[in-house]
Amino acid sequence: MKFEEEKIMAELRWNPLIKDWVMIASHRQNRPQMPKDWCPFCPGSGKVPDHFTVYKYDNDFPALSQNPPEPDDVETRIYKTKPSYGKCEVILYSPEHTVTLPELPVPHIRELVDLWTERFVEISKDPKIKYVFIFENRGDVVGVTMPHPHGQIYGYSVVPKKLELEMESCKEHFEETNNCLICDMLEDEVKDGRRVIIENEDFISFLPFYCEYPYGMYIAAKRHIQNLTQMTDREKTNLAKILKETAGTLDSLFDYTFPYMMCMYQNPVNGEDVSDYYHFHIAFYPPMRSADKVKFNASSETGAWAHCNPTAPEEKAEELRAAHEKFLKKMNG
């Protein structure tokens, strides 16, 4: 049997079982291994400016593109394809190669918040973009290949399934109660108090009642807002503060750079108005359940979306509050 020469594919393919789109991006397999003594994100590499604080860098191997190729002719009566239209950007947090988010001063993180805001606005101008997703992967255990401190932004041409489910739940709650679901969640968390870790004038960091990961903290805005552009100057600075303290709390648990996935949830763009019922929040998904043990998303979590947290959130919240105190003492030196 003769096999065809390997072909580069970049398209979206429809999963009819759960009504969701899968990104096919075979060209990402060809990402080169970087030499250990060279980093494209460091000043002097020729890839980035010699002087910057934070910086937007177009992904060299994007899963989504604003000039995507036509999909392969593989559609059937069941299977659908569409172009892998979208935007993939890298957001460099600092010119320093080994610094981490909680080690940056608040004014520096505030510049990062401003850059996120600027990119949210710019990417949203494209009418084909339906969701702007800001995120960070940190640590080898979540597959990070570039240690230089950075996050990413994806502009999707569809609203991803999980976010669609969140919107539906929030809308249903609003129609039943005339309240925002996340506003009500915050009210319950504050009233209970046991899972609240950090609080400032504008944001709360807490371990949700239902958290799937032992140390999976959320940050939510106290005011009912949907995205970064609606924040006041004070709110943006307080977001920078609570991001620093939340990431620093995780690092202080076991005195090492704690791996995590950080995801920012904002309203969809160029579509239905969700301002009555959706609410800005950030979720941290740290894959560790102890200093040296990983909480794997195994068969139940992956195959059934049935998550099992092997710890009690109320007990882990006590650990996190102690780690927060430890971080503050270190920060205030």
Please describe what each predicted stretch is.
Residues 2-148, 154-226, 248, 259-262, ...:
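Active-site microenvironments that recognize anionic phosphate/pyrophosphate groups
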Residues 226-235, 239-244, 273:
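A contiguous, surface-exposed recognition patch within enzymatic or periplasmic domains that forms
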Residues 238-257:
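Extended C-terminal subregions enriched in glycine
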Residues 268:
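An internal, amphipathic alpha-helical element
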